[in-house]
A protein has these predicted regions:
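Beta-propeller-forming repeat regions
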Residues: 1-174
Length: 174
């Protein structure tokens, strides 16, 4: 096991590392056990990630079934999602707000998404709509999406909030 974070980030969070390891080379060639000691690691909290995919949970008579969203939904992190029937077929669709421009320096920007509309198939599976069909195409650092009737006409608009960017609002074609 090796450290996940780089030396710069780690020593800012834990200043003792700078004195203990002194150089980037020493940090890079160390294992977690040599940095933190086996006893410290044994005492530490441990978390396990079972999936990183964007998913939905379907309630099947008291237990939940995890269903991963299509590959297009996995292109970038999503900090916001909204359920709305965008095509008036009686089935809820999903809108995702994609991208993350400010992770840790050593991770780099996660900016491969344009946000995404997923058409519900009625069985907790979803089909991605091309951006040319949905009209949704946002290359910014979106943080939230909400469906809200902004003009009082009974039809919900889809509003995207961006980090350090303008709000973008989409309306249904009439």
């Amino acid at each position: 096991i090796v450290p996940r974070r780089g030396f710069s980030c780690s020593q800012l969070a834990m200043p003792f590392l700078k004195d203990k390891l002194k150089t980037f080379h020493n940090f890079a060639s160390s294992t977690l056990e040599t940095i933190y000691t086996p006893s410290r690691l044994a005492e530490s909290k441990k978390y396990e990630v079972n999936t990183l995919e964007h998913s939905v949970l379907m309630n099947e008579a008291g237990h939940f079934k995890l269903i991963n969203l299509p590959r297009e939904a996995q292109i970038a992190p999503s900090f916001g999602s909204e359920l709305i029937d965008i095509d008036d077929d009686g089935v809820l669709d999903i809108i995702l707000a994609h991208n993350f421009f400010s992770p840790q320096r050593e991770t780099g920007r996660m900016d491969g998404g344009l946000s995404l509309a997923l058409k519900g198939n009625g069985d907790c599976t979803y089909t991605p709509l091309p951006h040319s069909v949905s009209g949704i195409s946002i290359s910014g650092d979106t943080r939230r999406v909400i469906a809200i009737d902004l003009d009082g006409n009974g039809i919900k608009e889809i509003a995207f909030a961006q980090n350090n960017g303008p709000m973008i609002i989409y309306s249904k074609k009439r």
